[in-house]
C-alpha cells in the first residue's frame, strides 16, 4: 500500500521519482511576484512596529489615585491583547505569502539536490535548450525569513556546481539572474527525455512559462488599481505601491478602495518619490506614516473622510504641495511644520476638532483658499494677516468671538464666511477689503455693522441674517454698495431701512422676513427687492423736498443776534 496521495510503484524507479518531483512542484500555488514578497516583508515589519508602539503607549498610561491598580492592569492587558490580535490580522496575508515564498525556495533547493542524484553521463548527451524570450525574466529575490534565505543560498550553490539534466535545463530554460525559479517544471521533462530516450533530447510541448504573475498587482496607467469596485487588502496595497514605485507612477487614486481593516499606510509609500497626485480619501485610516514626507514631488494630497487624529511633522517636507484636503477627519491640532508648505494654495481642514491654528500658518504666503469651518476654534491667529494671497476664507461653524484686526491686511480677499459663530462685531479694518464680493456673517450675535464696512463697494452678496435680537439697524451708508445683488437681513430686529437703501439699483434678492419693519411697510417688502429699492428712493426724494428752506441771515441778524449772551437773546426775543 503506497503513501497517501502517491501512486503505487512511484518509488520503485528513477523514472517514477522524477515524475513525482514534477507533480509536487506543479502542485504549488503560483509563486509570488518579487514586488509582493518585498511588500510582505515591509508589512510584517511595520505591523510589528505598530504593535510595539501601541504597547508602549499603553504602558505609559498612569492611573489617578481613585483608580485601583488591578483595574488599570486589566485595562492595559486588554489593550495589549487587542493590539496583538490586530497586528496578527494585519500580518496574516503577508505571513501566508512569505510562507509560500519560503516553500518555493525550499523546493528550489530540493530540486537541486535531486539533480545531483541523477547519472551525470546523461547530461553530456543532452543539448542546451534555449528558453523562449517571453519566458525569461530578470528578477531580484528578497529573502523570506531566515529559512528561505538559506534555501536561496543553497539553491544558488547547487546551480553553480550542477552539470546534470535538471541543472542544465533549469539554467537554460527557466532560471533567473539570481537563481529564482518559476513553478514551471519543463526542465524535469527535458532531463528525463535526455536520460531515457537514448541520449536524444525529445521535443516538449510544455514550454517554460517563466515566473508566474497570476497574483501580481496590475496598476493602470492612470494610477487606478484594478476594478473600481475592488477593495484592497493590506498586502495588495503594499504590492501595488511596490509596482507603482518601479513604474515611476505620477498619480495614485485609492479613494474608497481600501478594506475597512486597513488603518495605516505601509512605510513603503515613501518610495513613490515621483508621485504628483495622491488620493487616499474616504477610507478608515487612523494615521499617516512619517515616510509620507518623502514624496517630494507631490502637488496634490487628498485624505478627506478618514479617521486621522494626528499628522506627522514630516508633512512639512512636502515642499511641492499645492492642494491639501484633510476635511472630515479627527484632527485636534495641526503641526507647526505645516508652515513649511510654502507653495500651498488651497488648504481644507474643515469638519475636524481643531481648537486652534498654529501661528506658522502665516508663513503660507501663497495660500489662496483656507477652509477651517466646523471645528472648535475660539479665534484665528493674528498671523493670518500674513497670508497676503488669500482670496477665500471659510471659518463658519466655530466659536469665534471676534475676528483679528489683521484680517484687514488680506487685500485680495473676495469671499468671507464666518456664519454660525459668536461674533458681536466686525473689525473696522475690513474697510480695506475693497475686493470683497461675498460676506456671510449670519447666525452670530452682531449688534451693528461698522459704517466703513460699506467702503467694500465691490460686494455682491451680503448675509447678515439671523442675528436675532442683536442687530437693529443697517449702516446708513449701505447705499455705497451699489454692486450689491443679494441681501439677507432676515430674522433680526430691523425696523427702518436707511435712506441710502434706494441706491442699491442692482439688488435682485432681498430676504427681510421676520423683522418688525415699519419703513418700508410690510406689503412693500413682500413685493421684492426692486420694489423696496424704489420705495426707499422715492421716500428719500420726498424727504429732501419737504425739508423747509432756512432763511438767510442778514447783517442785522449778525449785529443783534450773534452775541453769546443767552439772556440778552431771550430779552430781544420777548420784545419782538
Curated annotation (Swiss-Prot):
Q: Which domain of life is it from?
A: Eukaryota
- What Pfam families would the database entry show? LRR_1, LRR_14
Residue numbers spanned by region Disordered: 130-181
Query: Which InterPro entries does the record match to this protein?
Result: Leu-rich_rpt, Leu-rich_rpt_typical-subtyp, LRR_dom_sf, LRR_domain-containing, LRR_R13L4/SHOC2-like
Quick one: a GO biological-process term for this protein? response to light stimulus
Biased-composition ranges for Polar residues? 160-180
Q: Residue ranges for motif GVYW?
A: 528-535
What protein am I looking at?
Plant intracellular Ras-group-related LRR protein 4
**Organism, as annotated:** Oryza sativa subsp. japonica
Q: Taxonomic lineage of this organism?
A: Eukaryota, Viridiplantae, Streptophyta, Embryophyta, Tracheophyta
* Gene that specifies this protein: IRL4
